[in-house]
Amino acid sequence: MGNPENIEDAYVAVIRPKNAASLNSREYRAKSYEILLHEVPIEGQKKKRKKVLLETKLQGNSEITQGISDYVVETTEPISPANQGIRGKRVVLMKTFPLEGEKVGREAALFIVPSVVKDNTKYTYTPGCPIFYCLQDIMRVCSESSTHFATLTARMLIALDKWLDERHTQSHFIPALFRPSPLERIKTNVINPAYATESGQAENSLHMGYSALEIKSKMLALEKADTCIYNPLFGSDLQYTNRVDKVVINPYFGLGAPDYSKIQIPKQEQWQRSRSSVTEDKERQWVDDFPLHRSACEGDSELLNRLLNERFSVNQLDSDHWAPIHYACWYGKVEATRILLEKGKCNPNLLNGQLSSPLHFAAGGGHAEIVQILLNHPEIDRHITDQQGRSPLNICEENKQNNWEEAAKLLKEAINKPYEKVRIYRMDGSYRSVELKHGNNTTVQQIMEGMRLSQETQQYFTIWICSENLSLQLKPYHKPLQHVRDWPEILAELTNLDPQRETPQLFLRRDVRLPLEVEKKIEDPLAILILFDEARYNLLKGFYTAPDAKLITLASLLLQIVYGNYESKKHKQGFLNEENLKSIVPITKLKSKAPHWTNRILHEYKNLSTSEGVSKEMHHLQRMFLQNCWEIPTYGAAFFTGQIFTKASPSNHKVIPVYVGVNIKGLHLLNMETKALLISLKYGCFMWQLGDADSCFQIHSMENKMSFIVHTKQAGLVVKLLVKLNGQLMPMERNS
């Protein structure tokens, strides 16, 4: 616990699991827990509030764990039924934290108090009293710079989240953490003479003594045993001996080490019985390890619904590499299949270890109703084939099981039905609807072929999946619709964003790997238009940081492209109002500089319109715009989000949210709020290293010997892209 003399403040994290099943999981999920937090007003801001952990002072002359336990009970009495308070299982010291400011040199301790599993008990809301919050919701918005939390509370919550993640990997730790305390287990044992009927019961109210029949009835009520068997010999004077069916003596015992050259493998009939017993053990183990698979196999809808509510995964493969939906389709369990697809959101094209799909199993078994359910699913791949290249129709006609004629008819009719479509947007807001011939199995490569672009143009672009604050380039073999389905999980893995506010869409965008030397040779007007739309979008959003003169030139080119040639009567001084400036000037310059640029923009616009040496054809103007953008350091970059820490004073650090841009030129950091370019490093002039758990990466500039660390969940993606793009460059390009 460190030096107790330095510890005054005790912070308490009261946590409870939402369900008992999560305690046995080796995978940590923050959404499986709730945490007790206070809300207090922010100083000087009456309406705004921040969340803090429970806090108390440690009394040097008292027993610490008992004091904290009593404090939790006292604090939670107003919100609990009958003012009983919340009595934790135990008090565990997690970590100590150094204090800052006036309390430098002292420490605060974070104690964890595990509570009972969440039940239907209604806790009343009382102003000024703590309430339970979902831990996942808290961690999504928790950072040391967040105004929603006290700084020390934020640090402690982040440490708690990491601590729980680590402890879930340790066998039996989490169940032991939430196990009733030894004193509670003794008091609630019915054979204890001082049996407590309720937890927290006062010692003077304990019932003293039970008869054997009363103990039996209590045990039946508490343990819910199917049968209760008395030992008839217990307490009697009868003599008894152990009865055995057979005694086998090892004839080789005591004869020394055997001659292994003479050992023979027994015949198969001699070990057949032993092998069958092993099979039985495996079957019993399968039932215990995969309850969702068993309920799907048996068509137990009630159990299936309950397990899905407890967040059992529909994608988990068992020891035979089958998912629950494979069993439901194999055994013809119609309702189980429907529940897994609708409630469990199971992928209808999920493959087992032998690359067979649910549709293969349903068709092979002649389960026409399940075939119909699968074919009606918008993401189904009607043309899916197994490891031997067989379609569901081939399997159906080979096996001829049950109602196979109806199943075959449905499969044949489905081939000619119109396909579902997906919208692929461009950066100007337009889109093309592309047929999904393989449902959610349709790959990026297949979608690109459906975009009706020439083979040459296709190589410059690819599909991106983007929401408001996260954009990812997909690879040719990726399946975009499955990424759309999994977007909440992807967001949770790579960001702290709220998935409810991030709606993913698919975009046709420039391939970040496209070399500038190749782009400069592009002549196709459609390719130039798509590149122009994306460059214009990034310019207006402030991602292209450049000198004022460059931004004014780009603005004049946009005026020529949008409004045509300059007309003195039409394009007067007042023409460039705030609304028109929005379409030609970066948002970061709109209020600070744009009003002072209007004369210079109009002047360049006029010169451009009257210049005879400049072609006024649209794709030539768009190419001129791109030529000016090529000189900007961040052109063509993929942007990630992160944080860097700078020293605001000797005692504390300032957190700066940043965009991390990676392109064919190098790495660039932009201030997230102002879009100011903080640093720009070319390949060959800096080194990088991925941090622990892919949570950060370190950059070292070889020119000015400067090093800094960027903290981001996207660190792994950033480093992979740096390695990829740096590897594309020739040594001469890297050093130029």
UniProtKB/Swiss-Prot annotation:
Residue ranges, annotated region (Interaction with RAP1B): 430-452
Annotated GO CC locations: cell-cell junction; cytoplasm; cytoskeleton; plasma membrane
Record's subcellular location: Cytoplasm, Cytoskeleton; Cell membrane; Cell junction
PROSITE patterns per UniProt: ANK_REP_REGION, ANK_REPEAT, FERM_3
Pfam families assigned: Ank_KRIT1 (PF24521), FERM_M (PF00373), KRIT1_FRMD8_FERM_C (PF24522), NUDIX_5 (PF16705)
Domain FERM residues, every copy: 420-734
Gene Ontology biological process terms in this record: angiogenesis; cell redox homeostasis; negative regulation of angiogenesis; negative regulation of endothelial cell apoptotic process; negative regulation of endothelial cell migration; negative regulation of endothelial cell proliferation; regulation of establishment of cell polarity
Molecular function GO labels: microtubule binding; phosphatidylinositol-4,5-bisphosphate binding
Repeat positions for ANK: 287-316, 320-350, 354-384, 388-419
Entry membrane topology: Peripheral membrane protein
Chain spans, region Interaction with ITGB1BP1: 172-195
Keywords: Angiogenesis, ANK repeat, Cell junction, Cell membrane, Cytoplasm, Cytoskeleton, Membrane, Repeat
Role noted for this protein: Component of the CCM signaling pathway which is a crucial regulator of heart and vessel formation and integrity. Negative regulator of angiogenesis. Inhibits endothelial proliferation, apoptosis, migration, lumen formation and sprouting angiogenesis in primary endothelial cells. Promotes AKT phosphorylation in a NOTCH-dependent and independent manner, and inhibits ERK1/2 phosphorylation indirectly through activation of the DELTA-NOTCH cascade.
Swiss-Prot/TrEMBL domain comment: The FERM domain mediates binding to RAP1A and RAP1B and is necessary for binding to phosphatidylinositol 4,5-bisphosphate (PIP2). The N-terminal domain has structural similarity to the nudix hydrolase domain, despite the absence of a nudix box and low sequence similarity with nudix hydrolase domains. The N-terminus and the C-terminus part associate together via the NPAY binding motif and adopt a lose conformation that is disrupted by ITGB1BP1, but not by RAP1A.
Protein name: Krev interaction trapped protein 1
